[in-house]
Amino acid sequence: MTTIQPFEPVDLFKTNNVNLDILTENFPLEFYFEYMIIWPDLFFKSSEMTVDPTFKHNISGYMMAKTEGKTTEWHTHITAVTVAPRFRRISLASKLCNTLETMTDVMPHEVNFIDLFVKCNNQLAIKLYEKLGYSVYRRVVGYYNSAEDGYPDTLKKVDDNKDAFDMRKAMARDRNRSVRPDGRSHKCYPHDVRF
């Protein structure tokens, strides 16, 4: 049985089963603490009750999000949504995303849209987000470039391993103004992503 609960500082010691995975982005401790302090209601975990006595409530995944922007750009940004390999393929990522949507579509947040960035070559994640109602708003060329790659010098050179799709889902108060049907054809540089 899955429960959704607020993420607590001590949970950082219980997420190895989630974070020690090549598909999961890891951050410095202060980054996690910043989210717990500033956006505590948008940083939550899924826990599983198991029969194993060493894990009373096994953390199966978590959602890290924040609110940002002003006026028409007021939105929730998903920084990380991740599920432990053992608990994948049982719709936990969908449950975490749906929980976030329910929370931020109403006051005190009442955002216009939810957005996230996903590597252009991550077809599994893209399909999941599309199933949840997200669509590509634009392609951010060179979003995942390393220091060795340098900053992109043209929008014409795309690389599915280095570029990100900025995916969005419009919320009730937005009425689809923050999404576009032809998002894959719109390209921008990483510095153009400002809220």
Curated annotation (Swiss-Prot):
Annotated InterPro entries: Acyl_CoA_acyltransferase (IPR016181), GNAT_dom (IPR000182), NatB_acetyltransferase_subunit (IPR051646)
Annotated localization: Cytoplasm
Alphabetical keyword list: Acyltransferase, Cytoplasm, Transferase
Keyword Transferase: yes
Reaction(s) the record says it catalyses: N-terminal L-methionyl-L-asparaginyl-[protein] + acetyl-CoA = N-terminal N(alpha)-acetyl-L-methionyl-L-asparaginyl-[protein] + CoA + H(+); N-terminal L-methionyl-L-glutaminyl-[protein] + acetyl-CoA = N-terminal N(alpha)-acetyl-L-methionyl-L-glutaminyl-[protein] + CoA + H(+); N-terminal L-methionyl-L-aspartyl-[protein] + acetyl-CoA = N-terminal N(alpha)-acetyl-L-methionyl-L-aspartyl-[protein] + CoA + H(+); N-terminal L-methionyl-L-glutamyl-[protein] + acetyl-CoA = N-terminal N(alpha)-acetyl-L-methionyl-L-glutamyl-[protein] + CoA + H(+)
Family annotation (SUPFAM superfamilies): Acyl-CoA N-acyltransferases (Nat)
E.C. code: 2.3.1.254
Limits of the N-acetyltransferase domain: 2-172
Any one GO biological process: regulation of actin cytoskeleton organization
Pfam families named in the record: Acetyltransf_1
Record flagged with keyword Nuclease: no
GO molecular function: protein N-terminal-methionine acetyltransferase activity; protein-N-terminal amino-acid acetyltransferase activity
A Gene Ontology term for the protein's cellular component: NatB complex
Assembly behavior: Component of the N-terminal acetyltransferase B (NatB) complex, which is composed of NAT3 and MDM20.
Further comment: Present with 639 molecules/cell in log phase SD medium.
Similarity annotation: Belongs to the acetyltransferase family. GNAT subfamily.
UniProt-listed PANTHER family: N-ALPHA-ACETYLTRANSFERASE 20 (PTHR45910:SF1)
Function of the molecule: Catalytic subunit of the NatB N-terminal acetyltransferase, which catalyzes acetylation of the amino-terminal methionine residues of all proteins beginning with Met-Asp or Met-Glu and of some proteins beginning with Met-Asn, Met-Gln or Met-Met. NatB acetylates TPM1 protein and regulates tropomyocin-actin interactions, it is presumed to N-acetylate 15% of all yeast proteins.
Designated name of the protein: N-terminal acetyltransferase B complex catalytic subunit NAT3
Species of provenance: Saccharomyces cerevisiae (strain ATCC 204508 / S288c)
Gene name of the encoded protein: NAT3
